[in-house]
Amino acid sequence: MTESERTESEAPAGWAAGPVREPRGRGRLFDAAVRAYLERHPEATVVALGEGLGTGFWRLDNGRLTWLTVVPPKTAAARRMLLPDGARRRTVARAVTDHAWLDAVPEPWRGVVVTAPGVLMRLPPPAVRALLVACAERFPGGVLVFDALPGRATALARRAAAAGGRWPAPRWGLDRAQLPRVACLHPGIVAVRELGPVPAVPGGAAAGGLWSRLVWRGRRVPVLRALTPLVCEVRFASATSPRAVPPGALRQR
């Protein structure tokens, strides 16, 4: 193993084992979706939007992928200091809404999986639509995985934020009944589905603990279903698919 390969595969120096442990709850759904995509496209690029100081690369690296972390410039400076770029991972200093980050994906034809945990709900609806359309046009055969709050939960979260709550108010929400509308945003979007249940923890332990199990089971109860968050995967048409549309085609109509 070369020095660069050793550095890539090992956890960041000075970090305890904790930061690279398996995530809980919804985080497992994101990891499972990435792993499933990498099984089909082992040399794909993983684009982690808003990852901050996350260490997903060390959890999911298969030795062949490329990893891009897209964060605002100030966050990017801190990440590069603590987690310097490597041969197959790089921090891109861009806001999610600055679509110049799409140009940083080196070889999209090898496959692209974009993850956006906690990201889309912080964007205004037009920015969410623009991001989905841009990815559909630029990443044929790729997928985007995101989470969202249903409309009722979004309204409650906004009230809590207005009352001085800890978390910022979400700007965009998505009900489960609205998933087909996402597929209609662009001809290059071929499927939108909710992911779940939360995958089991290796070794047979319950995934995500008691709270995650209760949340998942609560989806079967209509009242609770309207409040529980959802994790979704958007699939984009391959370049050879009859539904694939050249970049900018919709804007030219």
Regions found by a protein language model. Give the residues of each.
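Alpha-helical subdomain
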Residues: M1-T45, E51-R253
